[in-house]
C-alpha cells in the first residue's frame, strides 16, 4: 500500500508534464507565422489564417486580463482540422506552454475563438500561479467551496469526456473565463427572444457554487496573481423575499443592465404550467419584481407548488448563469 501511495503521489505531481505529451496532428506546411512583442509565436497550419489574422488573434488574446505570465506563453497554433475524434476547439499543453486551436478551416475570425482562447489561456494562467491546483486539498479547492468528492482527480490516467466539467483543471480554467476573460456586449432587444440566455458565457459546470459571487475566492486570486477582478464581474444570485398573487419579488445587487428570466413552473396532480417572465435591472434599486397580473395564469390556488429558477445575463459582458431550482408551496 505504501508503494502504491508513493507511485500515486508521483503521478499526481507529474500531471502537468504528463498531459503535455499528448500528441496532435500538425500538418507539415506552415502557412503563416507571427511573433508578438512578448515573444509569443503565432503559427497557422491552414490557408484560412494568414499573418494579418494571426495578428488579430494576438489582439484578441490581449483582451484577456493578464500579468507577467503572458510572457511565458510560447506559442498559439491554429490547425485546419479537428482534434482526434472530438469536436473540441482548443487545448493547452503545459510542458511546452502552447495553446492549440482546432477547426481553423471552419472558424476564420478571432472572435470565433473568443471563449475557447480565454479558456485555454485560463489553463496557462492556472498552471503559472497555482501549479498544484490539480491536486486534492489545494488551497484553491478549499476556497472554491467544492467538496473533494464532488470533483474528478483522475484525468491523466482515466480521462473521460463525460466528466470534463468535474476535473479541477477545467473548473479553474472556466473560473478564469468568467473573472478575467474577454467579453462581448449583447443587445437588450435580444432578451425577449431568449437568445442571450442560450448564447451567454457561463461556467461549464452549473452544479458547483457560483464563482461570480465568491468574494473570498476573488480576494485569494487577486492576492496570488496581482490581477484585480472588475466589479462588473460580480453577479450575486437573487434571493426570494415576497410572493403573492400579484408579484414575485427578489433582492438583487444594485446594478444595471442585468437581464433576468424567471422560470416559473406551476404544478398540481393534473397538470403543469410553465411561465417565463423577463426584467432588466436598473442601478437605482436592489429589488427585482416580476408582475403576475398580466400573465395567462390560472388561479395560483389551483396548484400545489411551484418550481422557480432564474436565468441571468449581464448585457455588458454576456456573462451569466442559472440559479438553483427552488420549490415553493402554494
Task: List each language-model region with its residue ranges.
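Pan-zinc metallopeptidase signature
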Residues: 6, 14-26, 31-32, 183-330
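Catalytic Zn2+-binding segment of zinc metalloproteases
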Residues: 121-139, 182-184
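Substrate-binding clefts and substrate-entry loops adjacent to catalytic sites
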Residues: 101-102, 139-163
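Auxiliary, metal-adjacent structural segments of Zn-dependent hydrolase domains
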Residues: 38-95
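Short pre-active-site segment immediately N-terminal to the catalytic Zn-binding motif
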Residues: 99-117, 164
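An active-site-proximal "capping" alpha-helix that borders the catalytic cofactor pocket
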Residues: 168-182
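N-terminal Sec-pathway targeting helices
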Residues: 1-10
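Surface-exposed patches in mature extracellular/periplasmic domains of secreted proteins
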Residues: 67-80, 133-138, 185-203
Amino acid at each position: 500500500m505504501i508503494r502504491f501511495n508513493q507511485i500515486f503521489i508521483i503521478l499526481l505531481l507529474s500531471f502537468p508534464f504528463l498531459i503535455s505529451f499528448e500528441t496532435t496532428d500538425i500538418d507539415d506546411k506552415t502557412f503563416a507565422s507571427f511573433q508578438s512583442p512578448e515573444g509569443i509565436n503565432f503559427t497557422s497550419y491552414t490557408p484560412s489564417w494568414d499573418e494579418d489574422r494571426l495578428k488579430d488573434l494576438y489582439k484578441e488574446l490581449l483582451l484577456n486580463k493578464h500579468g507577467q505570465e503572458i510572457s511565458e506563453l510560447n506559442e498559439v497554433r491554429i490547425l485546419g482540422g479537428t482534434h482526434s475524434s472530438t469536436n473540441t476547439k482548443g487545448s493547452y499543453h503545459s510542458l511546452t506552454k502552447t495553446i492549440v486551436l482546432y477547426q481553423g478551416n471552419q472558424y476564420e475570425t478571432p472572435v470565433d475563438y473568443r471563449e475557447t482562447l480565454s479558456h485555454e489561456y485560463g489553463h496557462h494562467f492556472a498552471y503559472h500561479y497555482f501549479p498544484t491546483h490539480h491536486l486534492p486539498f489545494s488551497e484553491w479547492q478549499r476556497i472554491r467551496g467544492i467538496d473533494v468528492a464532488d470533483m474528478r482527480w483522475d484525468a491523466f490516467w482515466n480521462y473521460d469526456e463525460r466528466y470534463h466539467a468535474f476535473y479541477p483543471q477545467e473548473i479553474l480554467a472556466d473560473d478564469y473565463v468568467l473573472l478575467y476573460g474577454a467579453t462581448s456586449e449583447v443587445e437588450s432587444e435580444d432578451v425577449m427572444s431568449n437568445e442571450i440566455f442560450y448564447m451567454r458565457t457561463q461556467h461549464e459546470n452549473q452544479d458547483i457554487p457560483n464563482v461570480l459571487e465568491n468574494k473570498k475566492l476573488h480576494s485569494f486570486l487577486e492576492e496570488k496573481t496581482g490581477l484585480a477582478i472588475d466589479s462588473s464581474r460580480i453577479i450575486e444570485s437573487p434571493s426570494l423575499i415576497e410572493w403573492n398573487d400579484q408579484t414575485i419579488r427578489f433582492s438583487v445587487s444594485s446594478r444595471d443592465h442585468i437581464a433576468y428570466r424567471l422560470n416559473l413552473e406551476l404544478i398540481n396532480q393534473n397538470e403543469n404550467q410553465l411561465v417565463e417572465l423577463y426584467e432588466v435591472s436598473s442601478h437605482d434599486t436592489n429589488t427585482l419584481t416580476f408582475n403576475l397580473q398580466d400573465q395567462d395564469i390560472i388561479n395560483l390556488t389551483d396548484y400545489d407548488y411551484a418550481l422557480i429558477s432564474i436565468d441571468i445575463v449581464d448585457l455588458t459582458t454576456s456573462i451569466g448563469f442559472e440559479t438553483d431550482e427552488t420549490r415553493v408551496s402554494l
